[in-house]
Design a protein with these regions (language model features):
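Serine-esterase "nucleophile elbow" of acetyl-processing enzymes
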Residues: 2-68
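Alpha-helical cap/lid subdomain in secreted, periplasmic
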Residues: 26-34, 51, 59-68, 74-217
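Conserved small/polar residues in nucleotide/adenosyl-binding loops
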Residues: 218-223
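Ala/Thr-enriched low-complexity intrinsically disordered regions
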Residues: 227-228
Length: 229
């Protein structure tokens, strides 16, 4: 095992030296467990997979990856494709974020309308999880949602049902309740990880608009280490 991949670690160093770290890991005379991992992303996932591979190799797992096209996580899960069907994953990781929420509360919405949006959003994910479970019969790791990087309602954003913070907290609780009731379904808690890093830095609008990364690239080792654990 490499000490560079043990907590606490230097994210910038790992990103910069990922090729040499991988080479050192592969040079180790270690027998690893092969695993096929499908990464279904709501944003760009190339470098996430690159870092995820390092942490898995360091933990004694030899991964091969299927990577969905940009933003095609739901379509791949629901309808599959020739490549994914041939791949046959041992584990599915769904990388989504606040930016993948399709419908957010508006100030003019009634409580009933907001609850309908919540229910529709949750069912969008639930039907996908159930389809994956029925198709592949393997563990599923699902990101929850980071808090919004801006608050339209200020300090009331988490208390008023019109607030996006309130909405995200409810969604995260619904995800957690589902995980508690279903085996082989796990949450990768990016809500906590983004808070530790800092929401302003995590949201990184430049990286989103330039590369469609849902979070600052330098945060990659943090959520990926969470997923591998």
């Amino acid at each position: 095992m490499l000490h560079e991949l043990e907590y606490p670690f230097d994210s910038e160093y790992i990103l910069k030296k990922s090729k040499s770290l991988k080479r050192r890991l592969l040079e180790e005379n270690t027998q690893r467990i092969p695993k096929k991992i499908a990464v279904l992303g709501g944003s760009t996932t190339h470098d996430i997979i690159r870092i995820l591979e390092l942490f898995l190799l360091n933990q004694g797992i030899e991964p091969t990856f299927y990577e969905s096209e940009y933003g095609m996580y739901w379509e791949d899960a629901m309808f599959g494709n020739e490549e994914l069907n041939a791949f046959g994953p041992d584990l599915v990781y769904i990388h989504t974020s606040f930016r993948n929420l399709r419908s957010l509360p508006e100030v003019k919405d009634s409580r009933e309308q907001v609850e309908d949006k919540l229910r529709s959003e949750f069912e969008h994910f639930q039907v996908m999880w159930e389809k994956l479970a029925d198709t592949w019969h393997c563990p599923i790791i699902q990101d929850n949602f980071e808090l919004p990087y801006y608050r339209l309602m200020g300090n009331q954003d988490g208390a008023d049902f019109h607030g996006r913070t309130w909405y995200v907290n409810r969604m995260n609780q619904m995800f957690a309740d589902y995980a508690a009731e279903h085996q082989n379904f796990l949450i990768n808690d990016i809500c906590y990880q983004s808070a530790v890093y800092g929401l302003d830095e995590w949201s990184a609008p430049f990286f989103w608009h330039m590369y469609k990364y849902s979070c600052l690239l330098y945060t990659s080792p943090s959520p990926r280490d969470g997923a591998t654990s």
